[in-house]
Amino acid sequence: MYRKLAVISAFLATARAQSACTLQSETHPPLTWQKCSSGGTCTQQTGSVVIDANWRWTHATNSSTNCYDGNTWSSTLCPDNETCAKNCCLDGAAYASTYGVTTSGNSLSIGFVTQSAQKNVGARLYLMASDTTYQEFTLLGNEFSFDVDVSQLPCGLNGALYFVSMDADGGVSKYPTNTAGAKYGTGYCDSQCPRDLKFINGQANVEGWEPSSNNANTGIGGHGSCCSEMDIWEANSISEALTPHPCTTVGQEICEGDGCGGTYSDNRYGGTCDPDGCDWNPYRLGNTSFYGPGSSFTLDTTKKLTVVTQFETSGAINRYYVQNGVTFQQPNAELGSYSGNELNDDYCTAEEAEFGGSSFSDKGGLTQFKKATSGGMVLVMSLWDDYYANMLWLDSTYPTNETSSTPGAVRGSCSTSSGVPAQVESQSPNAKVTFSNIKFGPIGSTGNPSGGNPPGGNRGTTTTRRPATTTGSSPGPTQSHYGQCGGIGYSGPTVCASGTTCQVLNPYYSQCL
C-alpha cells in the first residue's frame, strides 16, 4: 500500500540500463504453474522467472565501468537521460549466489540478505511466458491460487505477490531504445508511480536524480512509472492485506516529479493512480486472532497455507484459505453500514467513511479497476523491507502518532519501533519467502486440498458474507453468487441464488457457482 520508497531497499551498488550486455549470462530459473479449466482439470505450464532490471549490474557498453555507484550516477557516462541510455547496458544475473533466488519445480524461494561480492537485499521477479515475454493473466471472471510460506518473515518484511498492468514485452515495442526488454526484467510500473527506477521507457532517470538520505544504494529521479496494481498478497508472519489500486489510465505511463504522486512525491495524491487502495487486512478490521504465528490463530503462519482469490465479473473480490486440508473463508467485517466478507463497492465506500481518505473512489474505485483485471496483468513476486515507513502500514500502528482508538490505525501487533531496515537486515538476514503451487482458471476451477481437521481439532470457521435478501416462497435464506453454501461445520444458507448451483469443492467448502 505505501510501497516502496526503496522496494529495492538495498541491493548491489551498481546501476541499470535498457540494453543488454553479455559479461554475465542470463538464464531464467524455471518455474512450473497450472492452468485450470471449468470442472477442475488443470494442466502444467512450463514457465520461468526473471529478476527486475533495477537489481542488475549496469556498466558501460564497451567496458565493465559502472554507470552508477552507491546511489549516484557516473557524470561521464550519464550526463543526461538519453546519453546514459546509449552508454550503458544491463547484464545477466547469477540468481542464487547474488540474489538468493532459487526454484524447484513449482516452488520459488526468495532470500532476504545474500552476501556475495557485495550485499544484496530482497528481489522482485516476474513470471515469464517465454524467454522474452512476461506471462499475462486476465483476472476478471477467474481465480488465482497459490501456496505460501511466511514462517520466516518477521515484522518489517513483506513477501508480496501481486499483479501490475505492465507491458508483456517489457516495453520493447513502444520504446525502441529499450532493447533489453522482458528478458532482462524491464518495464516495471505500479500504483505508487515509482521514481526509484533507474530507467523508464528506454531512457535513463538520471535528470533530477536525488540520492536517498537513508539508503546508500537508492535515490529518486525526475520521472516515475505508473499503472494499475492488484496486491493479492502483502504479508509477513504477523499481518496480511489484499488491496486493489486503480489508476485513471490502466496501462504503463510515465509521470514527472511530484505530479507522479505516491510514496515518492511530496503530494501523495497528485498523480493518476490510487496509492492507498481499498485494503482488506483482517487485523485492521478487528479480527486479531485470524492470522498469525501459532495454534491460537485460525491461520497459523508457522505453517504453509493456500490462498485463493476470486475476481467476480461484477468487480467484487472474494478470498478463502486452505490449511491442513481445512477451508477458511475471509473473516467477516463489520464496518459502518457494511457487514460481510466480500471486497466490493459497499465495503470500499464504508472503509473510506470509517478510516478516512478518498483516493480509491477518486480514481474510479472498482469500476475503474475492472478495466485492469479485464486485460492482461503481469505476476510479480518479491521480498522487501521498507526505508520509507518501516512496513508499519502493514503490521503495526500507522501513522505512529495514532492510538488503538483511531479507526483503522492498528494494522498488526508489531511495535511501532520495529521494521527499521538496518535492524531487520542485521537481525534476520536468513529470512525468506516461498511461493509455490500457482494455479489459475475460471472461478471454482483451481480446487484445493481436502482432508481432516488440523491437529488439536477444528479451529473454527469464519462468518460468511451476509446472504442476499430472499423473495417469494424460497425455503429459507438464499446464498448469493460465489458465497459458501455447504461443508462440514457450515450452518449458513444452502440454497443458491437463481442461475447458480451449490458445488462441492471439498468436504469443508461448497460454493454457489
UniProtKB/Swiss-Prot annotation:
Residues 477-513 form the CBM1 domain. GO terms for biological process: cellulose catabolic process. Disulfide bonds join 21-89, 36-42, 67-88, 78-84, 155-414, 189-227, 193-226, 247-273, 255-260, 278-348, 485-502, 496-512. N-glycosylated. The catalytic core domain comprises three N-linked glycans which each consist of a single N-acetylglucosamine residue. It comes from Hypocrea jecorina (Trichoderma reesei). It catalyses: Hydrolysis of (1->4)-beta-D-glucosidic linkages in cellulose and cellotetraose, releasing cellobiose from the non-reducing ends of the chains. GO terms for molecular function: cellulose 1,4-beta-cellobiosidase activity; cellulose binding. Residues 401-480 are annotated as: Disordered. PROSITE patterns: CBM1_1 (PS00562), CBM1_2 (PS51164). Exocellobiohydrolases (CBH) that catalyzes the hydrolysis of 1,4-beta-D-glucosidic bonds in cellulose to release the disaccharide cellobiose. The degradation of cellulose involves an interplay between different cellulolytic enzymes. Hydrolysis starts with endoglucanases (EGs), which cut internal beta-1,4-glucosidic bonds in cellulose to reduce the polymerization degree of the substrate and create new chain ends for exocellobiohydrolases (CBHs). The CBHs release the disaccharide cellobiose from the non-reducing end of the cellulose polymer chain. The lineage of its organism: Eukaryota, Fungi, Dikarya, Ascomycota, Pezizomycotina. This is Exoglucanase 1. Belongs to the glycosyl hydrolase 7 (cellulase C) family. Residues 18-453 are annotated as: Catalytic. Gene3D superfamilies: Glycoside hydrolase, family 7, domain. The record marks 81 as: Not glycosylated. It is found in: Secreted. The enzyme consists of two functional domains, a catalytic core joined to a carbohydrate-binding domain (CBM) by a serine-, threonine-, and proline-rich, highly glycosylated linker sequence. It comes from the Eukaryota. GO terms for cellular component: extracellular region. It is an enzyme of class 3 (hydrolase). Residues 1-17 form the signal peptide. The gene is cbh1. The modification Pyrrolidone carboxylic acid is found at residue 18.
